[in-house]
């Protein structure tokens, strides 16, 4: 089974968790897109989707899913989103799609969070996938210097500003992304705290103690994982 098929079946399994009347957080990325498509196909009544990016909002509108802003709901019943890595205890690296801030805001407003992924996303330790760090544009070079100091404290390479063909990658919120490649993050909790202490850092892609369940697509079907 291809990785894309594994993503599809995990998204379809997650769509079965949604019930009529729910407020649903809609994740961002290729795996989350499969969930959004499967959710639309179910034709549930009175659901509202809270998108985590402009791209997800556009897809949901195209498929006819009613949307709500996060500020217009008191609680999100269920959020389904992908991940770049799934480590021990359902610790996650997210943000490869440059939507980590809005994703984390929706996750933290949710009663239940389910991560979906293909089998390759499961890892024994976080860090092979570059850790995204969202920073404000003003003074970002100096913020990068401070991030490099933190990286050195954790025996990690210095982060690099994420760029694309047209220049710097800019998030939906107008911020920039630095990626901290490592190979292995020995202490994700300590690193998360250190990154958040830097003025200019909006947030980072370490999602710790947030996922309630993972649905991982494999060649044998969907595997359910608990923290």
UniProtKB/Swiss-Prot annotation:
Keywords per UniProt: Isomerase
Active site: 103
Key word Isomerase present: yes
GO biological process: D-ribose metabolic process; pentose-phosphate shunt, non-oxidative branch
Binding sites annotated in the UniProt record for substrate: 28-31, 81-84, 94-97, 121
Catalytic activity, as annotated: aldehydo-D-ribose 5-phosphate = D-ribulose 5-phosphate
Any Pfam family the entry gives: Rib_5-P_isom_A
Pathway note: Carbohydrate degradation; pentose phosphate pathway; D-ribose 5-phosphate from D-ribulose 5-phosphate (non-oxidative stage): step 1/1
EC number: 5.3.1.6
Matching InterPro entries: NagB/RpiA_transferase-like (IPR037171), Ribose5P_isomerase_typA_subgr (IPR020672), Ribose5P_isomerase_type_A (IPR004788)
Signal peptide stretch: none
Cellular component GO terms held in the UniProt record: cytosol
Subunit annotation: Homodimer.
Family: Belongs to the ribose 5-phosphate isomerase family.
HAMAP family associated with the record: Rib_5P_isom_A (MF_00170)
Name by which UniProt lists this protein: Ribose-5-phosphate isomerase A
Gene transcribed to yield this protein: rpiA
């Amino acid at each position: 089974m291809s990785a894309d098929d594994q993503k599809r079946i995990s998204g379809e399994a997650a769509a079965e968790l949604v019930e009529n009347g729910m407020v649903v957080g809609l994740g961002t990325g290729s795996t989350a897109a499969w969930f959004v498509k499967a959710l639309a196909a179910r034709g549930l009544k009175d659901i509202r989707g809270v998108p985590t990016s402009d791209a997800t909002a556009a897809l949901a509108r195209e498929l006819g899913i009613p949307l709500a802003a996060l500020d217009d709901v008191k609680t999100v019943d269920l959020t389904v989103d992908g991940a770049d890595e799934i480590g021990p205890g359902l610790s996650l690296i997210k943000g490869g799609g440059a939507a980590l801030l809005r994703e984390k805001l929706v996750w933290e407003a949710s009663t239940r969070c389910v991560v979906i992924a293909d089998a390759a996303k499961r890892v024994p330790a976080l860090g092979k996938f570059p850790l995204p760090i969202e920073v404000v544009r003003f003074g970002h070079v100096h913020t990068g210097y401070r991030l490099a100091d933190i990286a050195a404290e954790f025996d990690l390479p210095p982060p690099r500003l994420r760029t694309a063909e047209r220049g710097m990658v800019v998030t939906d919120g107008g911020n920039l992304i630095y990626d901290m490649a490592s190979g292995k993050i020995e202490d994700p909790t300590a690193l998360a705290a250190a990154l958040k202490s830097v003025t200019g850092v909006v947030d980072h892609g370490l999602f710790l103690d947030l996922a309630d369940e993972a649905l991982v697509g494999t060649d044998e079907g969907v595997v359910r994982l608990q923290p």
